[in-house]
Amino acid sequence: MAYPFQLGFQDATSPIMEELLHFHDHALMIVFLISSLVLYLISVMLTTSLTHTSTMDAQEVETIWTILPAMILIMIALPSLRILYMMDEINNPYLTVKTMGHQWYWSYEYTDYEDMSFDSYMVPTQDLKPGELRLLEVDNRVVLPMELTIRMLISSEDVLHSWAVPSLGLKTDAIPGRLNQTTLLSTRPGLYYGQCSEICGSNHSFMPIVLELVPLKYFEKWSSSML
């Protein structure tokens, strides 16, 4: 869950988000080292007298600044590709949930059940209960079992939307006429908040997403009560 004046990422709640955080730290360290080297070279140039001003060719230097950037790019690309393949992999999902974006709410359908669907609207500020979050609470939460692979099918009824839950490392575009898919797996129970992340009209800011991840036995009780 985000908090005021937060500088870093939200706590990771899925294996994918943990991998993304590790990759962020990996890439940030490379950027830090390159920036330090560039600043060092600039400071050396500014504080020393120029020498070898007549040099026209330096094969060793050209070889280094060709090979070194290539190696750095490979160090960034390989873990990035690994995470991309992990995000695209779907193995025997326990549950499939179809998500449709509308102006300006979400609708959900549990396709493994015969008649289990609902709309999810933002709770107006005047209707909030003590402890609830402004602009993030919904009237119907998406209840899902934790520690199980869930497949999300995402599309839109009208304009472009984007279904995003940062703590789970999820952000998938909802495109009219196209069905995108992603997977989620939560490592611990809790409430996880997200929002539409694609500008979709005047009420774009009022399309929150709330996932309630619970143990399997509680999910089964909830699903039985919804049927």
Curated annotation (Swiss-Prot):
One of its GO terms (cellular component) is mitochondrial inner membrane. Its EC number is 7.1.1.9. Its cofactor is Cu cation. The chain crosses the membrane at residues 15-45, 60-87. It comes from the Eukaryota. It is an enzyme of class 7 (translocase). Keywords: Copper, Electron transport, Magnesium, Membrane, Metal-binding, Mitochondrion, Mitochondrion inner membrane, Phosphoprotein, Respiratory chain, Translocase, Transmembrane, Transmembrane helix, Transport. It catalyses: 4 Fe(II)-[cytochrome c] + O2 + 8 H(+)(in) = 4 Fe(III)-[cytochrome c] + 2 H2O + 4 H(+)(out). SUPFAM superfamilies: Cupredoxins, Cytochrome c oxidase subunit II-like, transmembrane region. Cu cation A1 binds at residues 161, 196, 200, 207. The modification Phosphotyrosine is found at residue 218. Residues 1-14, 88-227 are mitochondrial intermembrane. Gene3D superfamilies: 1.10.287.90, Cupredoxins - blue copper proteins. Residues 46-59 are mitochondrial matrix. GO terms for biological process: ATP synthesis coupled electron transport. GO terms for molecular function: copper ion binding; cytochrome-c oxidase activity. Mg(2+) binds at residue 198. Component of the cytochrome c oxidase (complex IV, CIV), a multisubunit enzyme composed of 14 subunits. The complex is composed of a catalytic core of 3 subunits MT-CO1, MT-CO2 and MT-CO3, encoded in the mitochondrial DNA, and 11 supernumerary subunits COX4I, COX5A, COX5B, COX6A, COX6B, COX6C, COX7A, COX7B, COX7C, COX8 and NDUFA4, which are encoded in the nuclear genome. Component of the cytochrome c oxidase, the last enzyme in the mitochondrial electron transport chain which drives oxidative phosphorylation. The respiratory chain contains 3 multisubunit complexes succinate dehydrogenase (complex II, CII), ubiquinol-cytochrome c oxidoreductase (cytochrome b-c1 complex, complex III, CIII) and cytochrome c oxidase (complex IV, CIV), that cooperate to transfer electrons derived from NADH and succinate to molecular oxygen, creating an electrochemical gradient over the inner membrane that drives transmembrane transport and the ATP synthase. This is Cytochrome c oxidase subunit 2. It comes from Rousettus leschenaultii (Leschenault's rousette). The lineage of its organism: Eukaryota, Metazoa, Chordata, Craniata, Vertebrata.
